[in-house]
């Protein structure tokens, strides 16, 4: 379902001190933007921000870059992030929110940024053959991620889509990533530390199992 236009979103984002209007300016120097040397985690397709809001407010010693493309969804993410921090009485200084085409992620990140972990949660499965190269786990995307992932950097990938998950296993192999952990039913796996996204809650209520893996960058 297409999200309705939200005229308030762009002005509210531009007045937000953790929204980055021109992320290309920080390429290669994101630690400087955070003003510390803490590890950086990257969420690709942050949606309404529920996931990064919980993660960031619970882990003040980790920096988070959260990316999506539409102002409408980023505006909601901004509000959800602020709400999570306010409820926990936490200072919001470890999240940077921005609009960026993920297919061009190397415009804003490079090897100097040394990203420790990437989260890909319930991305578009692009089931048609001619569209599969758009998948966030496709080999050509993984090659981009390798440029800025640190040595032994991780990708945490969750999806409800069986075909996407199975084909992504081959993508990771082609992209020289080792599968460190895999489950076809995350919620009965005993894996600790999972934070549910809004999509994950919806699919779980429908009885759809969440597939999950952790892939490690290899030399």
Swiss-Prot record:
Sites where the protein binds substrate: 128, 160
Q: Name one GO cellular component term.
A: tRNA methyltransferase complex
Q: Which positions are annotated as binding S-adenosyl-L-methionine? A: 43, 68, 101, 124
Q: In which pathway does it act?
A: tRNA modification; N(7)-methylguanine-tRNA biosynthesis
* Enzyme class (EC, first level): transferase
Top-rank taxon: Bacteria
Checking PROSITE patterns in the record gives: SAM_MT_TRMB
Extract the Pfam families matched here: Methyltransf_4 (PF02390)
Q: Which UniProt keywords apply?
A: Methyltransferase, S-adenosyl-L-methionine, Transferase, tRNA processing
An annotated Gene Ontology molecular function: tRNA (guanine(46)-N7)-methyltransferase activity
User: What reaction gets catalysed by this protein?
Assistant: guanosine(46) in tRNA + S-adenosyl-L-methionine = N(7)-methylguanosine(46) in tRNA + S-adenosyl-L-homocysteine
Stated EC number for the protein is 2.1.1.33
* Task of the protein: Catalyzes the formation of N(7)-methylguanine at position 46 (m7G46) in tRNA.
Family classification: Belongs to the class I-like SAM-binding methyltransferase superfamily. TrmB family.
This one is known as tRNA (guanine-N(7)-)-methyltransferase
Q: Which organism is it from?
A: Clostridium botulinum (strain Eklund 17B / Type B)
